[in-house]
């Protein structure tokens, strides 16, 4: 296990970090670069109270957004607006115009964006030798 600086810990086949380990202030926190992700794009955004991003779209990359903290409004190219609270997701296809606004006048909003282009999507997870459950002895109800 090695320390990657600023609290990012990298081990053999993994990396862990807190949001603040990936940067300070408002704007982008580069999850992909900070943790060494290579299979997809990943960023966290810290959006100040009342702030709105510019509109943007992508040529190939669809994006999945997860609102971690606060309340935001997504405005799409078709003119629709959707308010999302912490714990909510939004998927946006590559060519769809989008912009995001922090609905609070006093609190930051934090959201995570995971992006990638069409390709392999499948389930290839498996249990390591000797394991019989993904949850060990602590399986949640219904798992």
Language-model features and meaning:
Residues 91, 106-121:
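A short hydrophobic beta-strand segment most commonly corresponding to one strand
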Residues 1-39, 54, 122-143:
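A short, N-terminal "cap"/entry segment at the start of jelly-roll beta-barrel domains
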Residues 101-104:
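Asparagine-centered strand-capping/turn motif at beta-strand->loop junctions
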Residues 78-94:
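Short acidic-glycine-tyrosine-enriched beta hairpin
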Residues 28-30, 43-59:
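Conserved short histidine dyad/triad with adjacent acidic residue
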Residues 60, 80, 96-97, 117:
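A generic "binding-loop/recognition-motif" signal
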Residues 60-62, 66-72:
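Glycine- and acidic-residue-biased ligand/ion/polar-headgroup-sensing regions
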């Amino acid at each position: 296990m090695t320390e990657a600086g600023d609290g990012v810990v990298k081990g053999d086949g993994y990396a862990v970090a807190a949001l603040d380990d990936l940067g300070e202030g408002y704007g982008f926190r580069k999850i992909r670069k900070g943790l060494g992700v290579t299979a997809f794009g990943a960023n966290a955004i810290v959006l100040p109270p009342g702030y709105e991003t510019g509109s943007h779209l992508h040529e190939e990359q669809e994006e999945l957004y997860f609102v971690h903290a606060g309340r935001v409004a997504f405005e799409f190219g078709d003119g629709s607006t959707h308010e999302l609270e912490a714990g909510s997701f939004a998927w946006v296809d590559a060519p769809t115009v989008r912009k995001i606004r922090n609905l609070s006048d006093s609190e930051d909003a934090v959201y995570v964006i995971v992006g990638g282009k069409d390709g392999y999507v499948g389930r290839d997870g498996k249990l390591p030798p000797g394991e019989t459950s993904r949850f060990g002895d602590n399986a949640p109800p219904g798992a």
